[in-house]
Amino acid sequence: YLFAVICTIGLFTSCSDDDEKVLCPIGETTFTDSKGLQLTYSGEMMLGKSVIFTPNSSDATKATLTLTGNRELAMIDTRETHVPPISGVIPGQSTTTLNIENMIIDGNKVIFEGVEESNGCIIKYKGDAISGEMNLALEVTMPSNPLANTSWNMAPTGSMWEGDPMAPIHVKWDADEFPFGNGTWDINSAITMIFSMAQIEGKHIPELLSGVLNKVTFLPDGNIQAEYKDALTDTEWKTSGLNIAMYTVKDGQVFLFLNFAQILATVNERANDSMNDIVASLLPQLLQMVNRGIPLSYIVGEDGKMTVYLGTEVLLPILKTVAPLFENEEFVARLLDNPERTSWREAVLIESFLKPILVAMPQIVSTTKDIQIGLKLVQAEK
């Protein structure tokens, strides 16, 4: 009889313990922009990302957050059966895992915060979630690199007689000469001539660039910010938002990560048919670069000036993809068409100089040995 009483008491005690066991009110859930995710990075909204919340099955105070890109964006190009690695939340990381300790359960809500180190990055996180909604704030410090906390202005534009007439634009294109008039011409000289002669709103192309882009800053959180104007006539410089362009530095190269969703949310959708043709043909390669990072070479000279550029390994595959389009006369005509053209000088320049270059583009591309396109910069005063 005494043994039966002891067993009965033990049974009731066991049931009582089970009733008091704390359970996480949220099961494994994937949060995205369209599924309740409010993600901020350095205090500003970050779009196009995914956070998977996974509770610990044996300890309700623990969970993991898996940060990655939104896989739906990587599948925009349905012609590809293979989906490339997606650019994640932290620049250079396709996936980042945060291990939550001491999570607080408040009714149907979970509250958490902590610090995680991932591949040299220090990630401070704070957030909360209920079923179907998550708020997550990240403050990130990237590994130290030579560009962090530096700002650069556009190199000053010279003239055909003094300084560098192409600055701040950097172009080096080594290819066989192409037919031009009664002789031949090399593409490097042709580009220099056109950039120095063509004018938009009374300014040559290098001057135009310097007139709308003033400064580029590499922030320690992995963001790149630009100081810019929407138009030459604007009197004040604007600062670009965060989480649009991000970077890492690895093996002497800068890898640029563009937030596809963030760009689409702010992009001006005006484009002519020819540009749409080019974008469509390049979409698979563009998606690869957006997801894996665009490799930029950079050189800092003894004078402190920096040249940042896309190299042959990036540009030549792109050029080979679009080169066949220039064999189509209608495509070239559409590309050159500009209903707003009013200057006879501009018309002569396009017909006499630019059109022969575009027609010869397949030949130029097929004989290209080296190509660099980028920016020439000088360190900004602090």
Which residues does each predicted region cover?
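C-terminal motif of bacterial Sec signal peptides marking the signal peptidase cleavage site
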Residues: 11-14
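Sec-dependent signal peptide recognition
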Residues: 1-5
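Acidic/polar, low-complexity intrinsically disordered N-terminal segments immediately downstream
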Residues: 16-189, 334-382
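Contiguous, well-ordered beta-strand patches that form the walls/edges
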Residues: 62-123, 200-327
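Signal peptide-directed secreted proteins
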Residues: 192-195, 216-219, 225-227, 285-382
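Acidic, serine/threonine- and glycine-rich low-complexity intrinsically disordered segments
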Residues: 141-231, 235-238, 258-260, 265-275, ...
